[in-house]
Regions:
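Zn2+-dependent metallopeptidase catalytic core
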Residues: 2-19
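Solvent-exposed alpha-helix faces
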Residues: 93-94
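Long, well-structured alpha-helical subdomains associated
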Residues: 99-120
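Catalytic Zn2+-binding segment of zinc metalloproteases
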Residues: 54-55, 69-87, 97-100
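Active-site scaffold of zinc-dependent metalloenzymes
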Residues: 17-59, 69-76
Length: 120
């Protein structure tokens, strides 16, 4: 499978939101949020992988990034369960709204309701 590396300003915004630009760890953390290549997070390395063949709008890409980054930030394990997915979605909504990405947050909310309505 051919992969394409995406660059998004969102991932560095997240590092800034977590640490603040003046924190020396920001420079160390930036590479951890590198988008290496549809959407899974390698929690041990801190990488988010997105299939380069999947066509995503900017808001969809932000949604996937926020969801997968949430898995990393919440320290979810490889063998995730429905509760992990639900908490990653909820955390992604918070991250996106906090950064002013309202359209992307709405995508997560819509997907969240669709995905989790049976459990709510």
């Amino acid at each position: 499978m051919k992969t394409k590396t995406y660059f998004s300003e969102f991932r560095s915004d997240i590092a800034v939101a977590i640490l603040g630009k003046d924190d020396y760890r920001y420079e160390v953390m930036k590479p951890l949020f590198q988008i290496c290549g549809f959407g899974f997070a390698e929690t041990s390395s801190g990488c988010v992988f997105i299939d380069g063949e999947v066509k995503l709008t900017k808001d969809e890409l932000r949604w996937v990034e926020a969801h997968e980054l949430a898995h990393i930030m919440l320290k979810h394990k490889k063998d995730r369960n429905d509760n992990d997915e639900m908490s990653a979605d909820m955390f992604a909504i918070i991250l996106l709204k906090d950064k002013g990405y309202d359209k992307a947050a709405q995508l997560v909310e819509d997907k969240f309701l669709e995905r989790h309505k049976r459990k709510l």
